[in-house]
């Protein structure tokens, strides 16, 4: 498809949602919009933020706990309606695999750029606990600084839940750091932040998985600098895993029927584009201020009404 026909197709889709003269959109279905929740704060808060916007527009909403990788198949099959935080590095392959089968569409990209990587809290660098950081080669000689009670004298990297990345980090550690390092998997994102608090209190260094945008952007977090990522460098893609993570996009996905069943909600969803500060602030309401995910969403919606209400009007 050339650029001209692509523009024609895009215009045709837009005209099915609203005419340039401001014609009222077809009424959204009363069928609930099903929004998934996963296991990190910004995603759950944003689920309730988006659900709150849909409800303000008069829609019915349901929330379901969903597997972070399997959710794209659920969207394709129509069991889930949308996904609002599709992180390129972790979920890109599952996203595109479901799209290739049919039934899932790309609903746009957030303004925020992402990085999913291991690193250390800023105070580890400030206290020079491992000289040479953030260069990954510094870890080769200071593994003992990152040893914990369950690491057998080896340096420990605390990864997120294994369902997020599979063997990506064990493969990388084996390829670049060797036998003096071990990867342990946290049960949840909350376990990562609890380890940060405990490590600082105990005066020990810690090396954990993290991502940006996140609430830690404000507190300070230093990502390890590995050899540059290139397509196919990971072992799971046929490479040797001697590479770091790519900087990537943050997309939204939807079931292909969503634009027809809920044209107004889909138009609003396609317009939603949150930046790093906005996403980090959603997470901070939970991870720093201690609100529940639902209360955090309510607070965020109240504080940012001008931002989200602009996404819900008719027109281009």
What is each residue range found by the language model?
Residues 41-60, 172:
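Short, polar/charged alpha-helical segment
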Residues 40-41, 59-74, 184-195:
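Short helix-initiation/N-cap motifs at beta->coil->alpha
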Residues 116-128, 247-261, 284-285:
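A bilobed periplasmic-binding-protein/Venus flytrap-type ligand-binding module shared by bacterial periplasmic
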Residues 80-84, 157-235:
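Ligand-binding pocket segment of bilobal, Venus flytrap-like solute-binding proteins
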Residues 266-316:
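C-terminal functional modules
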